Every structure is written in C-alpha cells, then in structure tokens.
Amino acid sequence: MGVHSFWDIAGPTARPVRLESLEDKRMAVDASIWIYQFLKAVRDQEGNAVKNSHITGFFRRICKLLYFGIRPVFVFDGGVPVLKRETIRQRKERRQGKRESAKSTARKLLALQLQNGSNDNVKNSTPSSGSSVQIFKPQDEWDLPDIPGFKYDKEDARVNSNKTFEKLMNSINGDGLEDIDLDTINPASAEFEELPKATQYLILSSLRLKSRLRMGYSKEQLETIFPNSMDFSRFQIDMVKRRNFFTQKLINTTGFQDGGASKLNEEVINRISGQKSKEYKLTKTNNGWILGLGANDGSDAQKAIVIDDKDAGALVKQLDSNAEDGDVLRWDDLEDNSLKIVRHESSNATTAPQKRSNRSEDEGCDSDECEWEEVELKPKNVKFVEDFSLKAARLPYMGQSLNNAGSKSFLDKRHDQASPSKTTPTMRISRISVEDDDEDYLKQIEEIEMMEAVQLSKMEKKPEADDKSKIAKPVTSKGTEARPPIVQYGLLGAQPDSKQPYHVTNLNSKSESVIKRTSKTVLSEFRPPSQQEDKGAILTEGEQNLNFISHKIPQFDFNNENSLLFQKNTESNVSQEATKEKSPIPEMPSWFSSTASQQLYNPYNTTNFVEDKNVRNEQESGAETTNKGSSYELLTGLNATEILERESEKESSNDENKDDDLEVLSEELFEDVPTKSQISKEAEDNDSRKVESINKEHRKPLIFDYDFSEDEEDNIVENMIKEQEEFDTFKNTTLSTSAERNVAENAFVEDELFEQQMKDKRDSDEVTMDMIKEVQELLSRFGIPYITAPMEAEAQCAELLQLNLVDGIITDDSDVFLFGGTKIYKNMFHEKNYVEFYDAESILKLLGLDRKNMIELAQLLGSDYTNGLKGMGPVSSIEVIAEFGNLKNFKDWYNNGQFDKRKQETENKFEKDLRKKLVNNEIILDDDFPSVMVYDAYMRPEVDHDTTPFVWGVPDLDMLRSFMKTQLGWPHEKSDEILIPLIRDVNKRKKKGKQKRINEFFPREYISGDKKLNTSKRISTATGKLKKRKM
C-alpha cells in the first residue's frame, strides 16, 4: 500500500509519458501488489472474489507490456520484516472483525429482504373494494406443478458424454455379437427358444443393458426425437416394460425361477438341484466343448443324443436333393406352426440383389414370361404375440433429425438399410399357429415348395444395373383364397389415438417386395445345426442359431460432420435432401432444452478480460454452410491411426498457411512461434498434475499482505474499472480484433447494507501462496524473468534500479520512494498511450521533499511499518514537516507546551489549531517517536545485491495455450486471438528498428522545462517553506 495519501502529495509532479518511448526499456515490476489489486477489485455481482482473476489480469498486462516492447522483470515479496509483521497482526485482528461484520450485515440484509417480501405479499393479498368473492376450488392431489425447464452443466463429471455412451454401447456387442443386430431379435419368438441357453443368456443380458441406457441416445438426440414430453414419458415406460420382460426371461433361462415368460410356448425350465455326490464338467469333442448332464451327453458316437424326430433325416436329404436339382420353391408352402418374422422393407429400397449360385441364373427368365403355379391357400387360426425386440420400441424414426440434434446417432442400427424416402418403421406382430405339432413335418415339405416359387420372383433381366429392386409379378387366379393379412402397427400405432395409419401386408399382394436369395442359401438357413456341422461349418452352435434369425448389420450411414470417419462426396445426395424436407426437425420444448447449460451464470465471465466473437461466428457460419447440401461416406479400410494422421495433416497445412507471417527477427526477444495444433502431451500432463496438486494442497493465506484504507481500496476498484475499459479499446484498435462484451459491473445495489456487505467480503480475502505459484508459472511460459526478494519487493526494485539492472520501476506502491526508488511509472494500464512518470529529482525540486522527509511523512500518515498519528492527513503532515523541519522538533514542541499555558498563548494560529486537533484525537508522543527502527527499515532494507544481468526468453505459444486451457478453460483459438496478433506486431516493430529520440541527446530538464504545480494554497505554502529549507 505504501504511505497513506502520498500519491495525493506527489501527484502534481507526475508527467505523462508515451508508452512508445518505453520501447526496449528494462522495467522492474512489483508483482505482489498486482495480485492484491486483482483480489480486491475483481468481484462478481455478489461481492465474492472471482476465481483465477489474477491469472487473467497478469496475462492481459503482460501482453500489453510486450506489445509496446517493454522488457519486464517481476519481483515478488519474500520474507516479512519485524515491523511489518506487527502491522500484519493488527490488520488480521481488523480482518477478523470484518468477517464477523460481513455475517452480521448478511443477516440484516436477509431480514430486510424478508420484510420487503412479506409487505408485498400482504399488499397483493388485500382485496379491492369492488372485487367479487372468490370461490374456493380444491386442487387435484395428483396435479403436478409446471416445470419451465432444468439446467445442467455439460462439464459436470456426473453427466455421461456421448463418447462414454458410444464406448459402453460398443462394449455390449463385444462378446461374439458384433455382426448381430440385437434390435431385431424378439426374445418372445419360438426361434429364440430354439437357441442354446448360453446364447439366450448372452442376448438377454445385452438387451437388458441396452434398454437401461436409453438405447444410447444423448440428451440432444432425445430432444429432437421427442419434442413432446408425453411421448418421451411413454418411451421411458415402454423401456421399463421391456427391461422387466428381459429380466424375467433371463431368470427363467438361467433356471432360477419356473414359469413366467418361458410359458409362451408352454415350456417350463426346471432348475437343476445341486447334490454333494454329483458333479458337472465340460467334455471336449470334435466340435467344441459340451456340458455333460446325463448319460447320453453327445461326447462320442456311443453316447449320442437321441432325437425324437425320426423323419428329420429324411427331410434334410430331400431338401438337399431339391437344392441340387434346382427345384422351384413355393412361398405358400412355408406356413407351419413355428414363428415367422415379417421384415418390413421400404418399397423404394435399394438393396442389391444377391447373386444366384444355381443354374437358374444361366437360363434366366423374364418377369413377364414367368407364371406362377396356382396354390390353394388355407386360412388358419392365428394368434398374435407382441414383439419384444428393441426395434419395435416406442421410438419414432429419426433420420436426419438425429444428426442435426448435435451428436451422431452411433446406435441407430434399426434403420441402417436406409432408402432415399424412408417410411415409418413398423412393429412386427408374430403369428403362431394353434394347430397340433404333429403336422409340422408335413408343412415343412410345403414350405420347401413355396421357397422354390420365391426363386421365380427373384429372376430379373438386370439385377445390378438399376437402383431400385424390381418386383416379380405373380399370376394368381381369382378363385384363390386370400391369406389372412399380417397386421403391422407403427411405433406409435399401438396407441388408440395415434394418427398414423395401420400398415397391412398381404403375402399375395403384387407390390410386395421380395429379397432375392438362392435355394441353397435358404436351405442352409433351415437346415438343422447338426447337418451344418457335417458340412464342415466353422461357426459355433450359438452363432449358427443367431444367424438363423438375424442378418448382419449393414454399414452405418452417418451424416455427422464432426466425425473423423467421414469425408465429403463430390456429388450431392438428392435423396437425402428429399428426406430432410419430409422429416422436419421438431422444435425442442423449453423443459427439455440444452441451452440452459450455456446460459448458466459463470463467475469467470464477470471480469470479461478477453473475449472475441469473430472466431466463434466464423465457426458457426461454417458449420451452417457445410450442413447444407453436403453428404459424407464412410472411410473403410483405414485404422484409427491413419485417420488421425489425415486429419492432422489437414490441420497442420491450414495452420501453416495461417501463421506464415510469424517469422524470427531476433533471437534476443522472439523467435519462430510454433502455431501448429500439436501441443505436447507432456505439457498438458504437467499442467493437469500441477492443478491437481494445487487443488489438493490447503490454500493457506500468506503472511504478508497490504493494508489499504477504505478510500484507497475504493480507488483500486475504480482504477480496475478504468483499466478494463481501456483494455477493451486497446484490444479492439491495437490488436485489430472484434469488440468484446463489456464488463458486467456491480449489479443492482439494493441498499446500503448490500454495499457494506460487499466491502466486508473484500476486506476478508487474502492472497495465498498458490496464487503466486500460478503467476510465476505463467511468467516462465512467457519467457519473462522473475525473482523473489529477500524481504520487500519494492526495496528490491529500488536496489535493481540503483545497480543499473533496470531502467525504471512499475508499481503503485509509494513505499518505493522511501526505499530509494527514483524513476517510477504508475497507472501503466489506465490510459491507452500514456503513463504517469514520477522522478525523485522532480519531487525534490518541485515539493522540496527528499528521502528523509518522505520517511517522516510515513510516520505521520502511516505505512506498512507504522500506524501513523490519528487525525493527520496529507496537508497537515506536510505542513508539520515544513513548519518544524523534522519530527524531533515537532515532538519537542508538542510535549513542552502540553502543560505550559504561557507557551500556548504565544503560539500562532497554525500551532493552536494543530495542538487542538492532536489533543482531541488523544495523541501521545512518547520517547519512541520518531521511531529509529522505522527509519532504519527504509534506509537499510534487506535486499539482494547480485549484479548478474537478466535474460529474456521467448514466449512458448503451445505452453501458454495449454496453461490457459488448464487454468481458465480457454480453447486454443481464444488464446491465439491475443497471442498471434501480439507476436506479429512485435516482430513487425522489431524489423523496422528503433527510432532515436531527442531526449537521448539532450538532458531531460532542457526539454521539459519548469512545470507549474496545480496544488492547493496550503500545500503550496508548505512546499515553499520546504524548498527554502533545502536552499
């Protein structure tokens, strides 16, 4: 803080100096007072200290110093002198009182606010004279209050990111289910019951986990999918129902409970009871491992498992013979008592037909020439079983809306076979025959014949030339009996009030699309697993059964621009544009909006030191333009390393073009700045480790501190506001960047209590050692030297100036004059182009104050080493020095005339008024006044006398980026907005060279001349007396 009100005395002697004249000057900077200023002045709307404000403030000031070519040396406080330690003790007692005062003020403020609120309620509740009597209406007990919305922070560790969901969902398909679309599997089907228990357990476990994770969709995606909150609630309830079904099915499969979901086909799974004398072991066979639970466990030929179906072998032989002869299969012969999965395909599907492997491909058959055999269709009594697959969940088609929602739909496997114009996916209803099982084998023969008829419908002239699948038109007789249609409901069609129409699929319809397969492919699917093993199949039994009921997952067709796995196509996809028009993005409801997290109050933005909208606007506009009319394709055949290398090459080429004008001009000040986006991992790791260690340490306050008066602390706040406004202009004009948002100053002040509470909070905060370490880390990355003084930083700055290691001192602490400082620069960051310069020679010449007089003023006004005399202001103190010459004469005058009325009567008007003021303030001047210890502390401070010159390094751009990102969360682009233009301008100025000025050839006093002081009459009279004493 320095000497109280000393700047008011020395202020008239200051001269404005242009910042350009300080180019290439070595300046000692008192860093400790900077930290104190940021701690006291930078506050949020509630008066609390803004976290890391000292880092942002130092970063801003360092950039300005380097821009004007100033070479700074930062000096930090070290130990604490004995006299100052005593002052600190008294200050801490006062700080503790401030803390208690802050609590008391907060209670008063709360009581006042509650009183105001209570008065408003009473006032509003008073009925008017003309108002009618209000009728009481009971509120429904189930009526819930309206919730306008909720807020959350995207950086909250409790909120899972999209990458976390993607990793977790990918792990679900990691246990041999990579090529299986789990969403299409219906655990309630008969085919699922035929799978091995181990496979059923694996599938049910994956489905349970996937249903619990809301199928992997992010918040933004769900907002777009469900614009209505009621639809989202239905989706949640539907997921709970399916998860309960999966859980019950899993319990029944493992044998922990009988009955339940396993009774769909009237089979009960019995739990195996454990016995002490019985063991279960795995036996290795030629085809793998089997679990022996009985005598005929299938481990060898003698212990073969007996199959009840004696006709199965004959049936398979007949199937093989039909496949070899190329017989035609008829579709209506495939009806049996087992479950049929009806796959809904779009009429405009672009699925490529499979190549035929039999001789029917060579012969060929036009669709117009082929006629189908008339087959009698027998209606059957069927019952409908609900589809419990995830694909049939209550989830509408997302299409392009998911991509526009903000994150890629990496889990949408249900619509992978996408067509240019997709229709709404449907819920499949399986049908199960109610006839006896004895007719199964007879129906299988009819199924084979029906499959042969299917082959005729697959024959086309050019199956691979056209984009759309051609449909064979069968010829049927009018008398053919119609098959009962299979009803397919939409996802929301199960609701009675749904507006979506029902889709009815008739197997005799001419518009029904048929997927082409060969007879051998179909036979291979319907052949029992034992026969496939005889053919030398490599797949395990579980995989064979999974392939029996599911197809492989096709390639994903993402349109997410942010993904590294996609690149732009040269041709625009017209069909995707049509899809976007047909599927508009629904409006997000306010209660499900993600913008709330971005509108949360951030205390880091209250200071608003550095902000630019150019880069952000360019990114947003670029994102909008790339979203329009651009399509992407999946990069296959590349691993992650190759993809990252591609992206890195693109980024590096762009950065090189961007920063080509940054060149090395001199190794003394700057060198080439690496602007590639390749921050070393070690730097960021070190930053994270340092931050963690800092957070773990207890942030203890330092012993040293500054003691400002109330008026001086108010001036600090005003000066910081002026500095912020000046920096806005400096950043906008000098660095040629866009205007940033103005600083949010103190919000409304409700009353005097609120203002007093803010002052109390300001007084209670103290500088910590962690703050100093963070600032020193920032200086090292800028390449700026710094030292820690043995004791006082101001004394060390004055010593550096006397040793000619620096050319001036930048500080707002007036103690520097008392330690021997002669060239002081103050208010460096308040004006754009000027700074206040104070010279000890000018002060002596204009005010008549030398170093000894300044120390005597400190004992009257108060400083870090003494509390001063109560009631003594700057004018009275300088009048005392001018009237009595020194403090010893002043003490003799006061003590000798204290009880001598004769002397008091002979005193002049000034002496009478001064004595009256001292007596009213109960001033006692003892033998220790003036203090010799205070005089020695200022005249002979403990400093470092080392004469080693300082060396300035080169700012490390990558290290600065990582530091600002770690400490303040700044992205690299925001740091580059300040650093890159700064380095460019510095290099440009260095290239032009330094111009000689007239003050380098002539003494300064010949240029400036005598300056007329603008002081009060009393100070002018007192300084006149002082100057006469010096003559």
UniProtKB/Swiss-Prot annotation:
Gene Ontology molecular function: DNA endonuclease activity; metal ion binding; single-stranded DNA binding; single-stranded DNA endodeoxyribonuclease activity
Cofactor comment: Binds 2 magnesium ions per subunit. They probably participate in the reaction catalyzed by the enzyme. May bind an additional third magnesium ion after substrate binding.
Keyword DNA damage among record annotations: yes
Region (N-domain): 1-95
Biased composition annotated in UniProt, kind: Basic and acidic residues: 459-470, 679-694
Main location: nucleus
GO CC list: nucleotide-excision repair factor 3 complex; nucleus
Modified residues (Phosphoserine): 118, 367, 583
Region (Disordered): 342-367, 406-426, 459-480, 570-591, 670-694
Cell compartment(s), UniProt: Nucleus
Stated role: Single-stranded DNA endonuclease involved in excision repair of DNA damaged with UV light, bulky adducts, or cross-linking agents. Essential for the incision step of excision-repair.
Name the UniProt record assigns to this protein: DNA repair protein RAD2
Origin species: Saccharomyces cerevisiae (strain ATCC 204508 / S288c)
Gene: RAD2
